C-alpha cells in the first residue's frame, strides 16, 4: 500500500512539474520568436513590458483572459467550445512519453525521468497526434464561417497527408534501435546519435513535423492573405489562446522528439542530462523560428506535391536502404 501511494505521489509530482515547465516554456517561446524575428527584420521586438520585454508573455496572457469570449451566431456551440481544448490537450499529453534522463534514485525509490515509460511510446505519439486533427477540423466546421471551414478542411488534409511521411521517417530509427520505446531509442544512441546514420530520415521527419503542426512555410490552414486566420478566425479570448498554446507546445514536442530520435536525447558531456535535452529542444525551436523568418509560404498544390511526390517516396527508399544495411550488419 505504501509503495502504491508513493508511486502515485511521484506520478502527480512529475505531471505537475512537466505541465508547469511546458506552459512556462510555451509562453517564453512566443517572446523568443518575436525577438528572433525582429532581429532578422532589423527591428527591436517586444521591449516595453519589463526588461528586454521579458514580461510581455504575462501581459499577453492577461490581455487574452480579459478579452470577451464570443460564440458566432449559428455556430455549433458545444463543438466550437471544445475544439481548442482538444488541440491543446493532445499537444500536452504527447509530452508524457518523452524521457528527460536516466532513472534516478530518490528516498530509496528508483524513479524514471519520464511521465509514462511506455514500450510503445512512438505508437502513443502517433495516436494522440492523429486526434489533434479533430480539433482543427471540428473547430473550423463548428464556427459557421466559410473561412474557418476551408481552413479546417485544409488543416485536416495537410495533417493526414504528412502523418504518412512522418511515420515512414521514424521506421528506420525503429529498425536501428529495435524498439518502439523512446527510452530504448535514446539508450541505443549512447555511442553516436542517429542523425549520423539517418540524415535523410532526420530531414524528412523535421519537414513533415513542421507541416503537421502547421508552421510557416506550411501554415496554409491559417493563411492570412486568403482565409483571415483560417480555422480559428472566429475565436477570441482564451479559446484562441488554447490554439496558440497548442502550437507552441507542439514546437516543444517536435523539439523533444527530434532530440530523442536523432540527436541522442539526454546524452552529452559535462552538463546534466536534463540540461542537454533542454538545449537540444531550444535549438530545434530556433531552427523552426529561423525557417519562419526566411522562407515564403508554399502554395497549397506545392504543399501536397511535396508530401506525396517527394517525401513519401524518399522515405520508402530510405526504409529499403536501412533494412538492407541492418540485415547486412546483422550477418
Curated annotation (Swiss-Prot):
What highest taxon heads this organism's lineage?
Bacteria
Any one GO MF term held by the record is:
quinone binding
Could you tell me the membrane topology recorded for this protein? Answer: Multi-pass membrane protein
Q: What is its main location?
A: membrane
Q: What is its EC number?
A: 7.1.1.-
Q: Where is the signal peptide?
A: none
Where are the coiled-coil regions? none
What Pfam families does UniProt report for this protein, alphabetically? NADHdh
Show the stretches that span the lipid bilayer: 6-26, 79-99, 120-140, 155-175, 193-213, 242-262, 271-291, 310-330
Places the protein is found: Cell inner membrane
Which reactions are catalysed by this chain?
Answer: a quinone + NADH + 5 H(+)(in) = a quinol + NAD(+) + 4 H(+)(out)
Q: Tell me the GO BP annotations in alphabetical order.
A: aerobic respiration
One cellular component term (GO) for this entry is: plasma membrane
* UniProt keyword NAD present: yes
Q: Which InterPro entries match?
A: NADH_UbQ_OxRdtase_su1/FPO, NADH_UbQ_OxRdtase_su1_CS
Give the record's keywords alphabetically. Cell inner membrane, Cell membrane, Membrane, NAD, Quinone, Translocase, Transmembrane, Transmembrane helix, Ubiquinone
Subunit note = NDH-1 is composed of 14 different subunits. Subunits NuoA, H, J, K, L, M, N constitute the membrane sector of the complex.
Q: What does this protein do?
A: NDH-1 shuttles electrons from NADH, via FMN and iron-sulfur (Fe-S) centers, to quinones in the respiratory chain. The immediate electron acceptor for the enzyme in this species is believed to be ubiquinone. Couples the redox reaction to proton translocation (for every two electrons transferred, four hydrogen ions are translocated across the cytoplasmic membrane), and thus conserves the redox energy in a proton gradient. This subunit may bind ubiquinone.
Q: Per the similarity annotation, which family is this?
A: Belongs to the complex I subunit 1 family.
List, alphabetically, the PANTHER family matched: NADH DEHYDROGENASE SUBUNIT 1 (PTHR11432), NADH-UBIQUINONE OXIDOREDUCTASE CHAIN 1 (PTHR11432:SF3)
Which NCBIfam families does the protein's record reference?
PRK06076.1-2
Protein's name according to its UniProt entry = NADH-quinone oxidoreductase subunit H 2
Source organism of the structure? Syntrophobacter fumaroxidans (strain DSM 10017 / MPOB)
Amino acid at each position: 500500500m505504501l509503495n502504491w501511494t508513493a508511486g502515485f505521489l511521484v506520478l502527480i509530482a512529475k505531471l505537475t512539474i512537466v505541465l508547469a515547465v511546458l506552459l512556462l516554456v510555451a509562453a517564453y517561446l512566443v517572446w523568443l520568436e518575436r525577438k528572433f524575428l525582429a532581429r532578422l527584420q532589423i527591428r527591436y521586438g517586444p521591449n516595453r513590458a519589463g526588461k528586454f520585454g521579458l514580461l510581455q508573455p504575462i501581459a499577453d496572457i492577461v490581455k487574452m483572459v480579459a478579452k470577451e469570449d464570443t460564440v458566432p451566431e449559428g455556430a455549433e456551440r458545444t463543438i466550437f467550445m471544445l475544439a481548442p481544448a482538444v488541440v491543446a490537450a493532445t499537444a500536452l499529453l504527447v509530452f508524457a512519453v518523452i524521457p528527460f534522463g536516466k532513472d534516478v534514485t530518490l528516498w530509496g525509490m528508483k524513479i524514471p525521468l519520464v511521465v509514462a515509460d511506455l514500450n510503445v511510446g512512438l505508437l502513443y505519439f502517433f495516436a494522440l497526434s492523429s486526434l489533434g486533427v479533430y480539433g482543427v477540423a471540428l473547430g473550423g466546421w463548428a464556427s459557421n464561417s466559410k473561412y474557418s471551414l476551408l481552413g479546417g478542411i485544409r488543416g485536416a488534409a495537410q495533417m493526414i497527408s504528412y502523418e504518412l511521411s512522418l511515420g515512414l521517417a521514424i521506421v528506420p530509427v525503429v529498425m536501428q534501435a529495435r524498439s518502439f520505446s523512446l527510452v530504448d531509442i535514446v539508450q541505443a544512441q549512447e555511442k553516436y546519435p542517429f542523425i549520423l546514420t539517418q540524415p535523410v530520415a532526420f530531414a524528412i521527419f523535421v519537414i513533415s513535423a513542421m507541416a503537421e503542426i502547421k508552421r510557416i512555410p506550411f501554415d496554409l490552414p491559417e493563411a492570412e492573405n486568403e482565409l483571415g486566420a483560417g480555422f480559428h478566425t472566429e475565436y477570441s479570448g482564451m479559446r484562441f489562446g488554447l490554439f496558440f498554446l497548442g502550437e507552441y507546445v507542439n514546437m516543444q514536442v517536435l523539439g523533444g522528439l527530434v532530440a530523442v530520435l536523432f540527436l541522442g536525447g539526454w546524452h552529452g558531456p559535462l552538463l546534466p542530462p536534463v540540461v542537454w535535452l533542454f538545449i537540444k529542444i531550444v535549438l530545434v525551436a530556433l531552427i523552426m523560428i529561423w525557417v519562419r523568418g526566411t522562407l515564403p509560404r508554399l502554395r497549397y498544390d506545392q504543399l501536397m506535391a511535396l508530401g506525396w511526390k517527394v517525401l513519401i517516396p524518399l522515405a520508402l527508399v530510405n526504409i529499403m536502404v536501412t533494412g538492407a544495411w541492418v540485415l547486412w550488419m546483422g550477418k
